[in-house]
Regions:
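Extracytosolic ligand-binding ectodomains
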Residues: 1-155
Length: 155
């Protein structure tokens, strides 16, 4: 995947060269609009898949708390993934019966075994599960950047 920092360079170079295709990316590009020094107009029409939206009702409590604690910055999927990650690990620790007196190796072993057994619903997905390789099952949503905002694509 390409993340938003290198993607910003690609978009700037494309504009400088007069190259104007429809760019498509994934969740690694979420955050490009708030990157310091980036001209958001360069991302106009960019399509991306991301598991998080700061504009849907289900995330508003998190968005308001995050924005208040971070000088008005709106969270992107990286912030939401981190938030979910803490609670996913907490759930796995509890279900595995981990305690503070366990060795780190024993905790890791218990977590690996437990991760394929849990299902978690959070900011970035509903009923998320993990396979033995650690891959998560969650459905992203398609967005288009229009006028500096993430919007659902028109049918």
């Amino acid at each position: 995947p390409i993340y938003y920092q290198p993607a910003s360079i690609v978009l700037a170079q494309a504009k400088a060269m007069g190259y104007a295709p429809t760019f498509f990316g994934v969740d690694g590009m979420d955050g490009i609009l708030t990157m310091e020094g980036f001209d958001p107009s360069l991302a106009e029409g960019l399509m991306l898949l991301t598991p998080f939206s700061a504009t849907v009702p289900e995330t508003q409590s998190f968005v308001e708390a995050y924005t208040a604690a971070n000088d008005g910055v709106t969270p992107n999927q990286f912030a939401a993934d981190a938030y979910d990650g803490v609670y996913i690990v907490k759930e796995a620790l509890e279900k595995a019966g981990c305690t503070a007196d366990m060795s780190s190796a024993d905790i890791c072993e218990a977590l690996v075994a437990q991760m394929t057994q849990i299902s978690y619903s959070g900011l970035t997905g509903k009923d998320m599960t993990w396979n033995a390789e650690g891959q998560v099952s969650k459905a992203p949503t398609a967005y288009v950047i229009k006028d500096g905002e993430y919007v659902l694509p028109e049918a």
